[in-house]
Amino acid sequence: YSREIMHDLESRYCTINTGNLVVDAFVSNLLLQAKSLGIALQTDLKFDKDILPINDYHMTIILGNLLDNALNACKNQLNAKIKVSLRSADDNFSIHVANTYVITSPDKAPEDFESTDFIHGYGLKNVKNSAETCGGFCVIQHENDIYSVTVIVPMSS
């Protein structure tokens, strides 16, 4: 009986424990949603929680928008995949979110593909503003049906 309860708890509550509550909450929530939608999710979370150059407010803006956009882009896709990476390396901290996405309108630039459910078009602008406020920058790419956003912030900011 206790095995059944533990299995039930584990299957309902996929938890990430990096030590940063904002990251843990957003990525754990993404895990649950991706699992329920049949979206493959890969995470790479290697950073020191004690020396992040992005405060909780800006981390919430950046992760909230990027993960929401990735999840929305993957809904109703076959073989959908999302990759989330947060890493401290050398002098920089990077957040990289990539997802499968087939562009149906070739005239649009990658910056135009934002979640329609999240304040219609302000998501990526807010991500860019937060990155710049923290002394960093944002790179948006779309190649080979993979849409990705990378935020890089110097560790000294």
Question: What does each of the following model-derived ranges do?
Answer:
Residues 15, 19, 40-62:
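Conserved short strand/loop->alpha-helix "switch" segment adjacent to the catalytic nucleotide/phosphoryl-transfer site
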Residues 103, 143-150:
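Glycine-rich nucleotide-binding loop
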Residues 126-135:
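Conserved glycine-/histidine-rich ATP-lid loop and adjacent helix of the Bergerat-fold HATPase_c
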Residues 56-80, 130:
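Conserved ATP-binding N-box helix of the HATPase_c
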Residues 134-145:
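Glycine-rich ATP-binding loops of the HATPase_c
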Residues 93-125:
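Glycine-rich/acidic phosphate-handling loop/turn and adjacent ATP-lid/helix
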Residues 3-7, 19-37:
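Short beta-to-alpha transition helix within the HATPase_c
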Residues 81-91:
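Short beta-strand/loop element within the Bergerat-fold HATPase_c
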